Amino acid sequence: MKDGDFVTIDYVARVKDTGEIFDLTDEALAKKESMYREDVNYGPVTFIVGANFVIRGLDEALHSMEVGEKKSIEISPDKAFGPRHDELVKLVPESQFKQQDMKPSPGAFVNVNNIRGRIVSVSGGRVKVDFNHPLAGKTLQYELEVKGVITDRDGKLNAVLDYFTGKSGKVKVGKVSDNEVEIETGVDVQRRLKELIATTISKWIGVKTVKFVDVFRHEELRQGEQKQEDGQAAESKAGGKAVKS
């Protein structure tokens, strides 16, 4: 494989020391290991080699693989999620969580000043939060299989959309010409996400112009109406008012 290849792979990723699976594409294995989640789309995934879509050690391994090849690799922390830093374990006043109507508990993930961390302990009005990545300092093991390489432009466009939206269907490829592509978006696609999609398409597929067209489909509008109705009903039960002033 080389930089710019759209490679489709299956994988199982484990923490070396414990054998714990932290990521995988195999739905049957996820169910067997009691880690299946309904909100996850299982199956082979497509990455762009050299585009920083995956950790460095995995990207380097893909460079030396071919379609149909299977390989087990070991990735050191410096090529995975980096080393642990003691200074990223901090004490946060418990009152800061109470102000947000949160009850801190060990093991829970929280956002403090827009930084994600995991609560280690709660004691004496202070909460110890670890802001290291959960896999920082850990050596990882991957079982890889290269399923194929996408070469057609439509396939590449769909792969980019799937990567950034998790196969949610929120965005779809619309009209395509030599130098321009239209991306149909749903009702809740943020500007930052559009920028990431457009930048990736321009750099790795070579399309000069990326347009986003808002498409309001009946089922999406109905879902929005239902959420609004549910919110108004809940507010009514709580004795609140849903009046726009």
Predicted regions and their residues:
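FKBP-type peptidyl-prolyl cis-trans isomerases
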Residues: 1-245
